[in-house]
Design a protein with these regions (language model features):
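Charge-rich, low-complexity N-terminal segments
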Residues: 1-40, 87
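Short, Φ-rich (hydrophobic/aromatic) sequence segments
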Residues: 13, 65-71, 112-115
């Protein structure tokens, strides 16, 4: 997908959201705020043939227990297609890739909705989660045992 195609998809998405001037920045990034709480970043990933969506989960840096939960979620593919990761600043983000070949404004809007649903699920999970000191000492190979 070329930059003009990415810009066209964002423009189409903007029209469906009531933001007709939606376009990528010079750096190729588009940021959308939802509910005044979530900032979704939309960027083209040419090397992976994807449009990547990224959204922070909660505030602050991930602690060890949260990092373990994220790793387990990724291992079990429990994120509904979203991948939990640590941003360079240490905050937790969920990311979701959308295939460029299948990408349209409707597809992108559905993917954003799915990502935001996962972010909200994670935020609830992190509020409920109590620090689990023993979790850091558990053997991760337990998850890989066959029965």
């Amino acid at each position: 997908m070329s930059e003009p195609q990415f810009a066209r998809i964002l423009s189409d998405l903007g029209r469906s959201l009531g933001i007709p001037a939606l376009a990528p920045s010079e750096a190729g990034l588009c940021q959308l705020a939802f509910d005044g709480r979530h900032l979704v970043q939309v960027m083209e990933q040419g090397a992976r043939s994807q449009i990547l969506l990224s959204c922070a989960v909660g505030a602050g840096k991930m602690d060890g227990a949260q990092a373990l939960m994220a790793a387990q979620s990724n291992f079990l593919q429990a994120g509904g297609g979203a991948v939990a990761c640590a941003a360079p600043d240490g905050s937790m983000h969920l990311q979701l890739g959308v295939s460029r070949a299948d990408c349209s404004a409707d597809t992108l809007l559905s993917a954003i909705d799915a990502l935001l649903n996962q972010v909200e699920t994670w935020e609830k999970r992190l509020v409920r989660a109590e620090p689990d000191i023993d979790a850091l000492r558990r053997d991760p190979a337990f998850m890989m045992q066959s029965v």
